């Protein structure tokens, strides 16, 4: 038994104590240490210790150095360790008292080394000086820290942050999975100690700049193995040296600890307090005389005391070193340390020599294992597969708690036995594996470790040849550089039997793929059998010497470049030549494909064509199938409806309900038999159905009447702004001479499926300033009209000096102008290729006709077959050659019932053979009688199916007539049924273009005769780009809303919508991002976002209480990311549907309006848009469109709220500077209030009657379209006699179509006449009989037809209708008088087809030109569909519905509040639903009154729609409310009493709100009791 040896050491003053002019309060006299408290009015205390070290001043003769401390404490403890005892040295004291300095010191300075380095040095010095060969020494070390009551392994980088502390009945407390390193020298210990010290937790406090924030325990296990030659047995002695560096106790007010430092200090004080309690308890136990009643010692209260249990009163020789601060400011801490040390002297330890503990432990552990196995076996548990790691058992039935505890003890014992039984060599191998693991982690971090283990860096090859990986995907690159060492470097897969040097993966890589042999400075590639290897794109099978810069491809995807530094230095000129083109992965792959003769582009194009063909074919099949099913279901519904109507009529006529139900039940089970129609009847019915299905007379008239007001308003604004642009209606029909452009067609309409041409109502835009004519759709006019209105509103506020007058036209922001092409089309002509069927050349002179049916000239074209043996002589002009491809799916659409087309029955002529190439030429000879107003005339031609670049001639100056082109185009085609079909039915299209240069007299004459031209001027103003109201973004979930502009409106509601974008803040909440309102854009603000932060979009809908009931938001979609305000159109490919949170209704105490708010999570990276992913550049703005599909109670479809938002992306960590925030606040752009960080939007919700919706035909039958051409438009008086065209335009266009039809017929007849004459001349030469026509007639014409009485009656009626003249509308509602048409044209409508009767009976290809556009092989393409429709009509007739459901259809329109401010200022409000007056800032922008909180408020808080409001002002009203200067505004939902502020004029406010009422009041002298309601006309004018 021995007591704990205690020593104290007094350190010098530190810098903090010197700066505080502290006094020394400690004195050391021998082994007595006295603390003097008189200087600070406290008592003196003296203590006796085993050693008292005075290290206060180096010049003091009693100064104790580091060496002396070690010689008196460390040497003795090291001697005990060699004797076989467990020893422990731990330092105790407050923070900054010198504990770490005494224990560790400075390892690099021999004089300043602490106890631990000196002890380790002497340990190996004694081991090295051992001369006894029978004794072997082994040393293991472990290093851990206790930080915040958690144990951390400082030597193993892969260990977790918290190791478990366990207790064994034989070994006592130990740390599970603590790394023990085997060391062989003092240098190894120093390295491990340095690694551990780097991982320790230190921090700076006010008392110590490098304060230890954890307890460190450095353990050395010394094993002495002695071999006894007599007994041939090995005995071992184990001793454990525990060197403890405790963290210092501290006070928070002294150290200034906060946050994490304060938490660390609390845990440090907790463990040290527990250590003090343990010392006190052990001292008490040691001084007790009776040992029977042994008290409880709180070892387990702290991890530190639990691990040091053996060193405190256990099996250990323990020394405690108390470090003291001599300063008077640390008097209390020093006195506490002295008292702890004094108590520790009384602790008695029972140290024993640990002789040969392994044998004893192994035996005891083995007995314990056998005992536990028997216990578990008796309980029926199989422990043969017990795992090493405790707690990880195989899945099975849940074990009881005591059984689980015994099983865990068994695992612990087996684990300890395995660890004890490890040999010294195994421990060294384990240490080496951990060292390699550490180097591997460094290598994964991109660092290379040298062999000495000290140098870190990346080494570049200077002499060694190497392979550079060129893979384009970094994740597939394995390694970037492979070094080719001297000798053989093998390449293969990781699973090979002999691991290769270079590991590659992939299907084409063999287990042993190839070898690189580096001998005599040359590298040779040797491949294994069946290995795929390529050098510079060429496959090699024999050993090949590599040269620097060579491209090596192994397998299919592994591409390398071989580099030899020595060879590169010898031939730098070769490298310079190679450097002209970058050698990368793409270069090597392209080189490989070139060497193999693979044209990757051609293969891709071929596959794309096949996929497109398959897609079109499957699409047509699905559409046909869907159409059939739809028609069947509609027919069944109509039949059932008919039966219900019959039953109801029976009941209403007096029949019983029971009989009516019986009739209904029986009739539902019976269907009338279908009528048996003959083939002639089917043909007649089919023709009539097709005609009426595509008849457009009434729909075209409705479009003219309904949109006349828009054309008139556009012209009025054009005159007011002096834009030199005139707008007028125009009818365009899709014919061969006038094909419709895609932008004039309804979206998704396919003209190829129509048997008759399509006629659309367009807007003819005459740009009189540039002499150009454009055609707009009605929708485009409406969009441009919005911008025209904005331009008109802002024109009065802009000065003539605002910008360059031509900037708006050049930028394309002026809504009146479109860009016009340099070349204008003169006209079109068509040439058929029937002469090629007879192998004769033919020269055509065809008319060039424009879309108005006017002949603009003639074109001379030659079509000549080229014979196989013909020698092509080079003539003057241009000669080109091209190869054509004709695909069957471009022309032949199979019928729905699988019927074959007529092209399958066509036979090839003798000079044409299937799948054999056929050659002919097209020669454009001359253009005749082209007007001299066109210069640079050229002609281009193409086939109907080709959408590629057309064949074009060179432009010719129009200086003389005729214009000679002499352009020859040789064409090669592989003969097929498709091309043969084309020769029979389709022509080549010729288009003549020229630069239009009107004569000045002609241009001026046109301007003077124009009703608008007389009022146009040259004044131009610069207009900022306006933002057209966007259409809703297409939803992926909700159905697209069906708009019915003709349905009756049930109610209208004004909506105020706030849009917010919230970003995730540091506190975990979503905060609205800043909005800049100073730009004045139609978006009402710019959101200033940060890059890469989670966001949410918050939308709040506000409106007056009423019948509107919001259910929830079905979907919120965001898309159309763009850099400019206008959306260019196209498919919404970047649309993202956001994840929604449930919507909630919000209530406010002083506001009884309805507030509905919902949020959606928005991840902007999913748009894959560079505009949202990167930081915005200076001056850039990002625009996007969002649409919220809202579900309303009682509505059949969602209401769509659409808004365009403007964004700016800032860096993630950037903040708006104070200067910038101040500058923006001056102009009112940014406010600190979060209520300002939202963007408002004003909308009008119209609820329409859903029963009006139905098929287009039903809508047209139900609606009454009013002629809006007579409606008044502001500025109409400036238009003079101009009026929008009306019904007369339809008849004029009908005559134009008649002209085009006759021109087409004439040209077709001329073709056949030329061909017949040419064939007749050819036959005369051969003395053969000339037939009547070039080919035989399709069918014989009967000489007589017999008719019965019924047929004669029908023929008589038809002849009567033909002879009857249809009366013309002499007085159309609007426009000029219709021209009187001839009797022949009066019977044809816009879509009336031309007669099917052939003009030349003997010709097979005498189809009409208008049918060729629709593909003659699918003449009447929808025959089956219409037959199904007729079948449905035969089965049942539609009846009235039983129940008309009152379903509403919502329509939301964004209202752009005008920029003209009529009046603004403060007003007092008294609402009927609230109490008390409220002061608000009011801005009148007709037709709205905008309400704000004050004049600094940037967000609209409320709106009043003057179009639906009534203004009242009277003296009686003011007398009743007893408040002067008041008037009332009443809406459908609310009434406001508004009072002006002192100093304001009543007339000014009334004039701003209702000018008509103010004018009447002024006229009548302020009559009392005046109550006026705003008329509709004034409201509409104000709104426009």
UniProtKB/Swiss-Prot annotation:
Domain Kinesin motor: 3-347
Name of protein: Kinesin-like protein unc-104
Chain residues that bind ATP: 93-100
Family classification: Belongs to the TRAFAC class myosin-kinesin ATPase superfamily. Kinesin family. Unc-104 subfamily.
Coiled coil: 425-445, 598-652, 777-797
Record-level GO BP terms: anterograde axonal transport; anterograde synaptic vesicle transport; cell adhesion; cell division; defecation; feeding behavior; microtubule-based movement; molting cycle, collagen and cuticulin-based cuticle
Residue numbers spanned by region Disordered: 1366-1416
Primary location class: cytoplasm
A single GO molecular function term of this UniProt record: phosphatidylinositol-4,5-bisphosphate binding
Skewed-composition ranges (Low complexity): 1395-1409
Tissue-wise expression: Expressed in nerve ring, amphid commissure and ventral nerve cord (at protein level).
Function per UniProt: Motor protein involved in microtubule-associated anterograde transport. Regulates the transport of synaptic vesicle precursors in the axon of DA motor neurons. Regulates the polarized sorting of axonal proteins. Essential for the transport of synaptic components during the synaptic remodeling of the DD motor neuron, probably downstream of cdk-5 and/or pct-1/cyy-1 complex. Required for the anterograde transport of neuropeptide-containing dense core vesicles along axons. Involved in necrotic cell death.
Lineage: Eukaryota, Metazoa, Ecdysozoa, Nematoda, Chromadorea
Gene: unc-104
Keyword annotations: ATP-binding, Calcium, Cell adhesion, Cell cycle, Cell division, Cell projection, Coiled coil, Cytoplasm, Cytoskeleton, Microtubule, Motor protein, Necrosis, Neurogenesis, Nucleotide-binding, Repeat, Transport
PANTHER family reported for this sequence: KINESIN-LIKE PROTEIN KIF1B, STAR-RELATED LIPID TRANSFER PROTEIN 9
Polar residues bias spans: 1376-1394
Stretches the record annotates as Microtubule-binding: 183-335
SMART domains per UniProt: FHA, KISc, PH
Locations listed in the record: Cytoplasm, Cytoskeleton; Cell projection, Axon
């Amino acid at each position: 038994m021995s007591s704990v040896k205690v020593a104290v050491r007094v350190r010098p003053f530190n810098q903090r104590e010197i700066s505080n002019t502290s006094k020394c309060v400690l004195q050391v006299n021998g082994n007595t240490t006295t603390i003097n408290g008189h200087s600070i009015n406290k008592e003196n205390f003296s203590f006796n210790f085993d050693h008292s070290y005075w290290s206060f001043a180096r010049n003091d003769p009693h100064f104790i150095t580091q060496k002396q401390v070690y010689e008196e404490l460390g040497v003795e403890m090291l001697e005990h360790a060699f004797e076989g005892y467990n020893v422990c040295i731990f330092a105790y004291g407050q923070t900054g008292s010198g504990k770490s300095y005494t224990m560790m010191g400075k390892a690099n300075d021999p004089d300043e080394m602490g106890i631990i380095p000196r002890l380790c040095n002497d340990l190996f010095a004694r081991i090295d000086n051992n001369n006894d060969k029978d004794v072997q020494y082994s040393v293991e070390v472990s290093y851990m820290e206790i930080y915040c009551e958690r144990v951390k392994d400082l030597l193993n980088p892969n260990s977790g942050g918290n190791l478990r502390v366990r207790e064994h009945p034989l070994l006592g407390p130990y740390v599970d999975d603590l790394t023990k390193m085997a060391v062989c020298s003092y240098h190894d210990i120093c390295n491990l100690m340095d690694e551990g010290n780097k991982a320790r937790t230190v921090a700076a406090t006010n008392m110590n700049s490098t304060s230890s924030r954890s307890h460190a325990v450095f353990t050395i296990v010394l094993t002495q193995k002695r071999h006894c030659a007599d007994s041939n047995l090995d005995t071992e002695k184990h001793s454990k040296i525990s060197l403890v560096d405790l963290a210092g106790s501290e006070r928070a007010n002294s150290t200034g600890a906060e946050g994490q430092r304060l938490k660390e200090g609390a845990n440090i004080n907790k463990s040290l307090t527990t250590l003090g309690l343990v010392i006190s308890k052990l001292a008490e136990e040691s001084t007790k005389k009776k040992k029977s009643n042994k008290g409880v010692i709180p070892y387990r209260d702290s991890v530190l005391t639990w691990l040091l249990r053996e060193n405190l009163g256990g099996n250990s020789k323990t020394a405690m070193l108390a470090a003291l601060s001599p300063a008077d400011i640390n008097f209390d801490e020093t006195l506490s340390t002295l008292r702890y040390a004094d108590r520790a002297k009384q602790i008695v330890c029972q140290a024993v020599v640990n002789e040969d503990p392994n044998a004893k432990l192994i035996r005891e552990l083995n007995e314990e294992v056998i005992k536990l196995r028997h216990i578990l076996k008796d309980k029926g548990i199989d422990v043969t597969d017990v795992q090493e790691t405790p707690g990880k058992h195989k899945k099975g039935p849940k074990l009881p708690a005591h059984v689980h505890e015994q099983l865990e003890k068994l695992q612990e014992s087996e684990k300890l036995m395995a660890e004890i039984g490890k040999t010294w060599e195994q421990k060294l191998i384990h240490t080496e594996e951990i060292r390699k693991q550490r180097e591997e982690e460094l290598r994964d971090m991109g660092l290379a470790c040298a062999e000495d283990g000290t140098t870190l860096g990346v080494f570049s090859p200077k002499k060694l040849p190497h392979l550079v990986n060129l893979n384009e995907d970094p994740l597939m690159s394995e390694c970037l550089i492979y070094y080719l060492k001297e000798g053989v470097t093998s390449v293969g897969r990781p699973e090979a039997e002999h691991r290769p040097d270079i590991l590659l993966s992939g299907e084409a890589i063999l287990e042993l793929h190839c070898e690189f042999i580096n001998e005599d400075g040359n590298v040779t590639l040797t491949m294994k059998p069946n290995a795929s290897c390529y050098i510079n794109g060429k496959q090699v099978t024999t050993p090949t010497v590599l040269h620097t810069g060579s491209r090596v491809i192994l397998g299919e995807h592994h591409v390398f470049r071989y580099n030899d530094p020595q060879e590169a230095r010898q031939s730098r000129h070769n490298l310079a030549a190679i450097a002209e083109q970058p050698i990368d992965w793409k270069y090597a792959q392209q080189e490989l494909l070139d060497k193999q003769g693979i044209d990757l582009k051609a293969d891709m194009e071929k596959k794309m064509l096949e996929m497109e063909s398959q897609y079109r074919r499957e699409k047509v099949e699905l559409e046909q199938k869907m159409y059939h099913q739809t028609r069947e279901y509609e027919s069944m519904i109509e039949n059932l409806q008919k039966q219900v109507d019959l039953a109801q009529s029976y009941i209403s006529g007096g029949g019983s309900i029971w009989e009516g139900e019986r009739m209904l039940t029986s009739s539902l089970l019976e269907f009338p038999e279908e009528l048996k129609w003959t083939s002639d009847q089917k043909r007649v019915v089919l023709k009539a159905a097709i005609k009426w299905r595509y008849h457009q007379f009434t729909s075209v008239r409705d479009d003219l009447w309904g949109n006349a007001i828009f054309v008139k308003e556009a012209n009025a604004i054009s005159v007011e702004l002096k834009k030199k642009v005139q707008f007028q209606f125009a009818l365009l029909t899709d014919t061969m001479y006038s094909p419709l452009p895609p932008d004039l067609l309804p979206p998704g309409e396919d003209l190829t499926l129509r048997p008759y041409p399509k006629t659309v109502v367009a807007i003819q835009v005459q740009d009189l300033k540039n002499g150009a004519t454009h055609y707009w759709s009605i929708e485009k006019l409406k969009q441009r009209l919005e911008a025209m209105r904005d331009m008109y509103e802002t024109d009065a506020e802009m000065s003539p000096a605002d910008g360059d007058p031509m900037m708006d036209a050049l930028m394309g922001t002026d809504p009146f102008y479109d860009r016009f092409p340099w070349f204008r089309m003169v006209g079109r002509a068509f040439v058929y290729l029937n002469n090629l069927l007879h192998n004769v050349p033919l020269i055509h002179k065809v008319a060039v006709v424009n879309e108005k049916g006017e002949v603009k000239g003639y074109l001379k074209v030659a079509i000549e077959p080229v014979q196989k043996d013909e020698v092509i002589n080079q003539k003057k002009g241009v000669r080109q050659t091209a190869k054509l491809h004709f695909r069957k799916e471009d022309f032949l659409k199979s019928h729905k019932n699988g019927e074959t087309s007529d092209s399958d029955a066509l036979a090839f002529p003798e000079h044409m053979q299937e799948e054999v190439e056929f050659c002919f030429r097209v020669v454009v000879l001359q253009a005749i009688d082209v007007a001299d107003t066109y210069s640079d005339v050229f002609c281009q031609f193409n086939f109907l199916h080709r959408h590629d670049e057309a064949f074009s001639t060179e432009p010719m100056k129009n200086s003389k007539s005729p214009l000679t082109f002499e352009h020859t185009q040789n064409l090669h085609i592989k003969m097929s049924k498709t091309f043969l079909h084309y020769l029979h039915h389709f022509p080549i299209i010729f288009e003549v273009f020229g630069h239009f240069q009107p004569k000045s007299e002609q241009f001026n004459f046109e301007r003077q005769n124009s009703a608008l031209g007389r009022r146009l001027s040259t004044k131009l103003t610069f207009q900022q780009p306006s933002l057209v109201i966007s259409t809703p973004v297409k939803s992926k979930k909700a159905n697209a809303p069906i708009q019915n502009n003709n349905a009756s409106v049930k109610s209208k509601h004004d909506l105020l919508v706030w849009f917010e974008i919230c970003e995730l803040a540091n506190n975990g909440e979503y905060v609205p991002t800043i909005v800049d309102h100073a730009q004045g854009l139609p978006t009402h603000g710019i959101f200033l976002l940060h890059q890469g932060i989670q966001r949410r979009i918050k939308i709040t809908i506000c409106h007056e209480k009423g019948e509107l009931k919001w259910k929830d938001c079905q979907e919120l979609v965001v898309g159309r990311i763009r850099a400019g305000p206008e959306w260019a159109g196209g498919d919404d490919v970047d649309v993202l549907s956001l994840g929604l949170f449930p919507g909630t209704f919000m209530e406010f105490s002083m506001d009884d309006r309805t507030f509905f708010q919902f949020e959606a999570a928005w991840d902007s990276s999913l748009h894959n848009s560079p505009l949202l992913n990167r930081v915005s550049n200076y001056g850039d703005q990002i625009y996007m469109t969002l649409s919220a599909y809202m579900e309303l109670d009682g509505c059949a479809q969602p209401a769509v709220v659409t808004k365009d938002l403007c964004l700016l992306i800032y860096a993630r960590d950037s903040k708006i500077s104070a200067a910038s925030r101040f500058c923006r606040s001056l102009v009112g752009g940014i406010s600190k209030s979060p209520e300002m960080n939202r963007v408002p939007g004003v909308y009008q919700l119209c609820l329409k009657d859903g029963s009006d919706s139905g098929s287009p035909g039903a809508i047209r039958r139900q609606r009454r379209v009013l002629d809006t051409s007579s409606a008044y438009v502001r500025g109409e008086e400036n238009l003079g006699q101009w009026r929008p065209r009306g019904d007369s335009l339809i008849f004029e266009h009908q005559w134009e179509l008649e002209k085009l039809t006759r021109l087409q017929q004439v040209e077709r007849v001329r073709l056949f006449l030329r061909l017949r004459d040419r064939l007749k001349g050819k036959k005369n030469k051969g003395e053969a009989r000339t037939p009547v026509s070039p080919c035989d007639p399709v069918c014989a014409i009967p000489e007589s037809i017999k008719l019965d009485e019924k047929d004669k009656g029908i023929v008589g009626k038809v002849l009567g209708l033909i002879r009857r003249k249809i009366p013309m509308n002499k007085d159309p509602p609007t426009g000029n008088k219709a021209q009187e048409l001839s009797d022949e044209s009066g019977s044809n409508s816009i879509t009336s087809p031309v007669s099917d009767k052939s003009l030349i009976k003997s010709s097979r290809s005498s189809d009409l030109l208008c049918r060729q556009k629709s593909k003659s092989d699918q003449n009447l393409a929808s025959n089956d569909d219409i037959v199904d429709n007729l079948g449905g009509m035969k089965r049942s007739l539609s009846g009235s519905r039983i129940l008309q459901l009152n379903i509403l259809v919502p329509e939301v329109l964004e209202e752009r509040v005008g920029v003209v401010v009529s009046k603004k200022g403060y007003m007092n409000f008294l609402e009927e639903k609230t109490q008390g007056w409220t002061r608000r800032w009011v801005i009148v922008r007709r037709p709205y009154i905008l309400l704000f909180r004050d004049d600094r408020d940037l967000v609209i808080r409320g709106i009043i729609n003057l179009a639906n409001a009534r203004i009242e002002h009277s003296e009686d009203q003011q007398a009743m409310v007893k408040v002067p200067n008041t008037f009332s505004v009443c809406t459908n939902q609310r009434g406001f009493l508004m009072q002006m502020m002192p100093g304001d004029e009543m007339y000014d406010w009334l004039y701003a709100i209702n000018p008509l009422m103010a004018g009447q009041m002024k006229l009548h002298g302020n009559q009392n009791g005046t109550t006026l309601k705003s008329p509709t006309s004034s409201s509409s004018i104000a709104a426009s």
